[in-house]
Amino acid sequence: LDTTEGVISAVKYTIKKHGLDELEEKDLRKFIGPPIQDSFARQYRLEGEILQDLATTFRNQYKNVDLLKAKPYDAIYNVMDILVKNDVKIAVATYKRQDYATEILTHFGFNKYTKILYGADHYNKLKKKDIIKMCIDDSGIVNYKDVVMVGDSDNDAIGAENIGVSFIGVTYGFGFKNEEDVK
């Protein structure tokens, strides 16, 4: 799902509410994908409790106002149908909070493709490799060589590498913009 509109809207709200300097569009887009505290820490060079305050403001706004402003990528339903038809087990490993991810995937009908979904915890203690591992464990797959992580960011690629599964990078998401980025 392309969650750009909702994420950027919630980031702008958080910035305004906390009196932070406004950002250009290119910098706002950097908030899409990584854990929200990491994005605020990197962008504003912040640390400590303020990051949790910013994350709480963002999450409340995103959940209550901006969550469903997402759009499915072109042909994604067709791809999912083909995977299911070929008995491919599908799971979702995301840095979105699990409750948000469940709501958004259900809203857009992706829950018919998988019941295996794990996301970030409220305090962002889980790394991507932890989230991927939970998906694999829940799927019943025991041989990690049978697993492929499809993702659009360095976080996805590193998480897959750290747990020992293959990775396919895609450029239609937020992180990788071209084939060179994937390498």
Residue ranges and their predicted role:
Residues 14-15, 35-49, 104, 135-137:
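Helix-loop "lid/cap" segments that line or gate small-molecule binding pockets
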Residues 1-30, 85:
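Active-site neighborhood of HAD-like aspartate-dependent phosphohydrolases
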Residues 4, 11, 76-105, 120:
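Substrate-recognition element of Asp-dependent hydrolases with the DxDx(T/V) motif
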Residues 148-183:
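Acidic, Mg2+-coordinating phosphoryl-transfer loop and its flanking beta/alpha structural elements
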Residues 41-78:
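Metal-dependent phosphoesterase signature
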Residues 77-85, 136, 157-161:
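Surface-exposed amphipathic alpha-helices with a cationic face
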Residues 111-126, 146:
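A short, structured active-site edge motif that brings together acidic residues
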Residues 128-157:
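Conserved Lys-Pro-Asp/Glu-containing loop-to-beta segment of HAD-superfamily phosphomonoesterases
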